[in-house]
């Protein structure tokens, strides 16, 4: 039986997700365009535990923003970090029946395996693998108002089909070389 990874609301605004799919990972080096470490987490709509924790943390961040940033009220047009994958025009099937969030950090996240040993090889943690992450939701009021997502740490749980048509390995490309006797 496959192990399940239960989501947890660790503080009012900090969530440890259940099993989610990793996309657009920039975990070992900062992404050039934003100068931040970042990734996208794709959450199955059937993962009620993770979604419940995330929604609660978002509400708590809104309450914090109402009192600390937004002058006692929640502004109209508030940006919500939880996005519906089914509403995307060009998301592909990976976003069907899923939500996604984008998480960023100025600090490099710790990336670990199932035994909580550090992972140093960026090839080991790729778009399409399954992870759980700790993320923190916070209110902001610069360039508009909304709730942002801070990326804390990532734990790789299992392999998954690479997203974006990742390159084949040299082993795969050259495995049948012995069978190709062109001079033959």
List the predicted regions and their residue ranges.
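OB-fold ssDNA-binding interfaces and closely related basic DNA-contact patches used
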Residues: 1-100
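Intrinsic disorder/low-complexity signal
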Residues: 11, 83-88, 112, 170-180
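Residues in flexible loops and secondary-structure boundaries
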Residues: 18, 30, 49-51, 109-111, ...
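Residue-identity detector for glutamine
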Residues: 38-40, 110, 155, 175
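Residues in well-ordered beta-strands of folded domains
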Residues: 40-42, 102-104, 155-157
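Structured, beta-strand-rich domain cores
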Residues: 64-143
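Compact mixed alphabeta submodule
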Residues: 117-184
